[in-house]
């Protein structure tokens, strides 16, 4: 899409005990394929843990949803989702510009 996105990894909801499974090397093959596929489009900090990269690339996202809206509407959308019972709601990033076509992970 040729836009630059800042992704705030600490804001991404993660299912309980996932890190424990990743640490035990219980990782779906599709996840590693995902990570390999997106590697040219994603910039991670030099010290970013490999386990966190794997979690962000997880292929087990059945039901996962990402919505991109103008910043002006984020609070309203989050509040509306919460009132509708969508509890794992979080603003996890921002579209910065039409630059590199990259996702920059923080």
Predicted features along the sequence, with ranges:
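Glycine-/charge-enriched secondary-structure boundary and capping motifs
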Residues: 1-106
